[in-house]
Amino acid sequence: MIIRSPEPEVKILVDRDPVKTSFEEWARPGHFSRTIAKGPDTTTWIWNLHADAHDFDSHTSDLEEISRKIFSAHFGQLSIIFLWLSGMYFHGARFSNYEAWLSDPTHIGPSAQVVWPIVGQEILNGDVGGGFRGIQITSGFFQIWRASGITSELQLYCTAIGALVFAALMLFAGWFHYHKAAPKLAWFQDVESMLNHHLAGLLGLGSLSWAGHQVHVSLPINQFLNAGVDPKEIPLPHEFILNRDLLAQLYPSFAEGATPFFTLNWSKYAEFLTFRGGLDPVTGGLWLTDIAHHHLAIAILFLIAGHMYKTNWGIGHSLKDILEAHKGPFTGQGHKGLYEILTTSWHAQLSLNLAMLGSLTIVVAHHMYSMPPYPYLATDYGTQLSLFTHHMWIGGFLIVGAAAHAAIFMVRDYDPTTRYNDLLDRVLRHRDAIISHLNWVCIFLGFHSFGLYIHNDTMSALGRPQDMFSDTAIQLQPVFAQWIQNTHTLAPGATAPGATASTSLTWGGGDLVAVGGKVALLPIPLGTADFLVHHIHAFTIHVTVLILLKGVLFARSSRLIPDKANLGFRFPCDGPGRGGTCQVSAWDHVFLGLFWMYNSISVVIFHFSWKMQSDVWGTISDQGVVTHITGGNFAQSSITINGWLRDFLWAQASQVIQSYGSSLSAYGLLFLGAHFVWAFSLMFLFSGRGYWQELIESIVWAHNKLKVAPATQPRALSIVQGRAVGVTHYLLGGIATTWAFFLARIIAVG
């Protein structure tokens, strides 16, 4: 008799055909809500429809159904991303000067859009060099294509078609995993499996395949391009992949194949997996061999990380155990209960992810210029400025989103009865101490940082430069930052014995990399001016955090409104007859936080734009003399408010203001138009609902007189809606104004 061990139970993790596919609901706007589905009585209906269409919490309280909707929506989002990417590659294939740019990237600007000659708009097609007329683009796609080894517009065309196929696939997946095979709640809550797949699959194998592509395709093609070989003469990507001898001609160790890997003789691969540091003097970008090495190392780390968590085989970490073991001497129950929060509240989960991704995006912004990863990126000043600005804005929005969803979690998902003495409960119990201290810090930073500028403005007006805070009078040197710079400068050969240059040229040392007579990067000096503006950064960031954190910590209750949780995430005031309780909802804190986020990011991108033009970007003569765009005026001009207004905003706005009649004229119109959108927002922010309701009623009276009154009763926007419309136009107008100002300036002078 054979004794068999019992067969392990196979878990069924999907439900088959849970929701039938039907287009009928598409014809019923608001089908997800009994109230909205009735159709409009007043114009408020359309606003409620938009506010609640994607608020899956309000459609059902079934967590499994909510999870499936979110999961399906993610596939829809991926589909749109693939569609967008396909459009970018298609523009590169069909409307761009990519092949011309590839042959001479220092003298030809990137362009992938040619405006049709309708009512004189062809003026926008500027001469970007090489006889091509079009709009100069600043997205960095050309540089990334060159780094990936794309040598022809046909390859871009094929990639665009591939992306369309993937877009269709994602749309199908979104439908399939909601209507045909929808995962059960247990599948969404299986965090160990998710970690394994995301770490080992997405990040590990993703990085490994990119490293493989770089070694087998990008490196050889870029080596030929750097040597000046005509792109049409270079072998195609598949030839390098299929024919090892081609690679062995460039990198002799390729002839040995995988033998050095299995015999642990890894130094043989040092030809194409390097650890040099610094920039490639030909392209002004990081060494592509360094980048390949980096992705290989990252892949190994994540492949290991992806095998650390316990799934079907009974070994490995369990996340619940890790969290519950996490107790400090002063933290009570510690992280006990956090596992349950993060597996049942997707708002809590999303909040953490947004905070991390937002911070990471800002880190990306700072690395894109200090360690420019793609060839000829560093000398394309318009693209450098655009990438920095873009990633700063995106990071700011994501971080505010983190606070928004943390507050929604507090209002909708937090259960105070089951939480006692864990970290979150302890934070909530001493929230007054946190917020009052943070408030004190904001007041201190605000008065002192701004006070230094006001002092300088006053001394400047009185003609007493010797009494100003500046590099030539009373110095306030950023000694800590300079010490960090110095430490990194000295690292190669000392604490980083294998590296030949420091991680970034910005740290210091005498090195300067110029490509085609333009500065790519050089050591960035920090002085009193930077010390002053960095404290403005500290101030604006702390105020943003104060507003957002107060919104989260007081989302459920406060001394003013003890039952705030019952009023929900967004509400205008605590009912009629209770004065002084407006703008206290968690939503209002997000609303106010957005303005301070806008403040913070604006100061950062202004600082970056001026500092780079003053101290980094410029031209270099045959004798090695560097001439910066604004001639190093940052250190002495930016130490007064007047200097910022006069020598940055006003002086550098001349290009956008005088752009009419040139190929930059669209930026001039955008500059005006975006100012208008911004000003339009003030109408929503500075007036109350009653004013508009009164106005609407007299307009309705006139319509009734003429017997043209609509069946749907017009209503003024609610207080919350008015604020939402206001902040949207404020941010859109402000961002588009900045965009036009920056680009007209940098394309004209850069």
Swiss-Prot record:
Task: Output the superkingdom of the source species.
Answer: Eukaryota
Instruction: Kindly report the protein's main subcellular placement as a broad class.
Output: plastid
Protein's UniProt keywords contain Hydrolase: no
Q: Where in the cell is it found?
A: Plastid, Chloroplast thylakoid membrane
The record's listing under Pfam families reads: PsaA_PsaB
Record: residues binding phylloquinone: 692
- Which class of enzymes does this protein belong to? oxidoreductase
Query: What chemistry does it catalyse, as a reaction equation?
Result: reduced [plastocyanin] + hnu + oxidized [2Fe-2S]-[ferredoxin] = oxidized [plastocyanin] + reduced [2Fe-2S]-[ferredoxin]
Q: Which residues form a coiled coil?
A: none
Query: Which residues are listed for chlorophyll a binding in this entry?
Result: 683, 691
Q: Provide the alphabetized UniProt keywords.
A: 4Fe-4S, Chlorophyll, Chloroplast, Chromophore, Electron transport, Iron, Iron-sulfur, Magnesium, Membrane, Metal-binding, Oxidoreductase, Photosynthesis, Photosystem I, Plastid, Thylakoid, Transmembrane, Transmembrane helix, Transport
List its EC numbers. 1.97.1.12
Does the keyword field hold Chloroplast?
A: yes
GO molecular function terms attached to this record: 4 iron, 4 sulfur cluster binding; chlorophyll binding; electron transfer activity; magnesium ion binding; oxidoreductase activity
What's its membrane topology?
Multi-pass membrane protein
The entry describes its oligomerization and partners as: The PsaA/B heterodimer binds the P700 chlorophyll special pair and subsequent electron acceptors. PSI consists of a core antenna complex that captures photons, and an electron transfer chain that converts photonic excitation into a charge separation. The eukaryotic PSI reaction center is composed of at least 11 subunits.
- Alphabetical list of NCBIfam families matching this protein: psaA (TIGR01335)
**Function of this protein?**
PsaA and PsaB bind P700, the primary electron donor of photosystem I (PSI), as well as the electron acceptors A0, A1 and FX. PSI is a plastocyanin-ferredoxin oxidoreductase, converting photonic excitation into a charge separation, which transfers an electron from the donor P700 chlorophyll pair to the spectroscopically characterized acceptors A0, A1, FX, FA and FB in turn. Oxidized P700 is reduced on the lumenal side of the thylakoid membrane by plastocyanin.
What's the protein here called? Photosystem I P700 chlorophyll a apoprotein A1
Organism of provenance: Gossypium hirsutum (Upland cotton)
